C-alpha cells in the first residue's frame, strides 16, 4: 500500500509535481502525467483560455489531476492576488502557487511580496504554495500566515543546475513543520532523489522533463527517482564515517598453524 502524502486538504500517493510549460505540444501532457505517476500539475493562468478553445491547456489535463495554477507574471503581491482570484473564478480550484518575480535576469522570487500575497489569500480560503528563495525566517513567516507548504528553489528557474541550495533547503526541512517542496532548477532524476533523501516532502519539475530528448521517458525516470528517494529517507540511511569500516570479518578466517 502506497504512503499517503497529505497536503493542502488533499491526499496524494505521488510526491512528484509536474509543470506544464515548454512542451513542444500540449498533447504530451497526458502521457507525461501517466508516465510520472504525478497527480498534480501546475500551469500559468495566461495559458488557460476561458473560452475553452482547442488550445486551452485544461483540455489536455485529466479530470482526476489536481490543478495548481501559478501566478507567473506577477511582479508584486497585488498582481499575484488578482491572478489567484481569476484562477478560482475560472474553475481551477483553491490551490495556487504564488510566484512573485520582479528580477528579470535571474527570476528570483520576491520573498516579502510573496508573504504579503500568501497572508491575503489564505484568509480567503486558498491553499497557498509559495515559491521562495530558501530563507528560514521567511519560511517561518509563511508558516505563520497559513501557507500549505513552502516551495524553495533548488537553483534558478529553468537552469537545470540541480540542488545548488541544498544546505539552506536542509535547514528548512529541519526547522519548520510545513511540507518542503523543492521547486525550480532540478535537472536530473538523481537530484530529485537527493532532495527526497534529505527529507523534502515532494519535488516539482518542469524544464528537466520538457527539454529532454524523450520527455515521457524522463517523466517516468523522475517518478521512479522521487519514489526511490522517499523510500531511502524512510529507511534511514546509515551514518557516514571518516574511516573505513569493514563489512566482513578481517580476522579468524585463516587459522595460523
UniProtKB/Swiss-Prot annotation:
Cell location: Cytoplasm
GO cellular component labels: cytoplasm
Broad enzyme group: transferase
Statement: the UniProt record of this protein carries the keyword Transcription: no
UniProtKB keywords: Cytoplasm, Schiff base, Thiamine biosynthesis, Transferase
Pfam families, alphabetized: ThiG
Annotated positions binding 1-deoxy-D-xylulose 5-phosphate: 158, 184-185, 206-207
Pathway assigned in UniProt: Cofactor biosynthesis; thiamine diphosphate biosynthesis
Active-site residues annotated for this sequence: 97 (schiff-base intermediate with dxp)
Record-linked InterPro entries: Aldolase_TIM, Thiazole_synthase_ThiG, ThiG
An individual GO BP term: thiamine diphosphate biosynthetic process
One annotated GO molecular function: thiazole synthase activity
Stored SUPFAM superfamilies: ThiG-like (SSF110399)
Catalysed conversion reaction: [ThiS sulfur-carrier protein]-C-terminal-Gly-aminoethanethioate + 2-iminoacetate + 1-deoxy-D-xylulose 5-phosphate = [ThiS sulfur-carrier protein]-C-terminal Gly-Gly + 2-[(2R,5Z)-2-carboxy-4-methylthiazol-5(2H)-ylidene]ethyl phosphate + 2 H2O + H(+)
Signal peptide (from-to): none
Recorded family membership: Belongs to the ThiG family.
Function statement: Catalyzes the rearrangement of 1-deoxy-D-xylulose 5-phosphate (DXP) to produce the thiazole phosphate moiety of thiamine. Sulfur is provided by the thiocarboxylate moiety of the carrier protein ThiS. In vitro, sulfur can be provided by H(2)S.
Subunit structure: Homotetramer. Forms heterodimers with either ThiH or ThiS.
The name this protein goes by in its record: Thiazole synthase
Organism expressing this protein natively: Desulforamulus reducens (strain ATCC BAA-1160 / DSM 100696 / MI-1)
Gene: thiG
Amino acid at each position: 500500500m502506497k504512503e499517503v502524502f497529505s497536503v493542502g486538504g488533499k491526499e496524494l500517493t505521488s510526491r512528484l509535481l509536474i509543470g506544464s510549460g515548454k512542451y513542444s505540444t500540449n498533447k504530451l501532457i497526458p502521457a507525461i502525467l501517466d508516465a510520472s505517476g504525478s497527480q498534480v500539475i501546475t500551469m500559468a493562468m495566461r495559458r488557460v483560455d476561458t473560452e475553452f478553445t482547442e488550445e486551452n491547456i485544461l483540455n489536455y489535463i485529466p479530470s482526476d489531476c489536481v490543478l495548481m495554477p501559478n501566478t507567473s507574471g506577477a511582479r508584486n503581491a497585488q498582481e499575484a492576488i488578482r491572478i489567484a482570484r481569476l484562477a478560482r473564478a475560472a474553475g481551477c480550484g483553491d490551490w495556487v502557487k504564488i510566484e512573485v518575480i520582479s528580477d528579470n535576469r535571474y527570476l528570483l522570487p520576491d520573498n516579502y511580496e510573496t508573504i504579503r500575497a500568501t497572508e491575503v489569500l489564505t484568509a480567503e480560503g486558498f491553499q497557498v504554495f509559495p515559491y521562495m528563495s530558501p530563507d528560514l525566517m521567511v519560511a517561518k513567516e509563511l508558516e505563520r500566515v497559513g501557507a500549505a507548504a513552502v516551495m524553495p528553489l533548488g537553483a534558478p528557474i529553468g537552469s537545470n543546475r540541480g540542488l545548488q541550495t541544498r544546505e539552506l533547503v536542509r535547514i528548512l526541512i529541519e526547522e519548520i513543520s510545513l511540507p518542503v517542496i523543492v521547486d525550480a532548477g532540478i535537472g536530473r532524476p538523481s537530484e530529485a532523489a537527493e532532495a527526497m533523501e534529505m527529507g523534502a516532502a515532494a519535488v516539482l519539475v518542469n524544464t528537466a522533463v520538457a527539454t529532454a530528448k524523450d520527455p515521457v521517458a524522463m517523466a517516468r525516470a523522475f517518478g521512479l527517482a522521487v519514489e526511490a528517494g522517499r523510500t531511502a529517507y524512510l529507511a534511514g540511511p546509515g551514518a557516514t564515517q571518516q574511516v573505513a569500516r569493514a563489512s566482513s570479518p578481517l580476522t579468524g578466517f585463516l587459522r595460523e598453524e
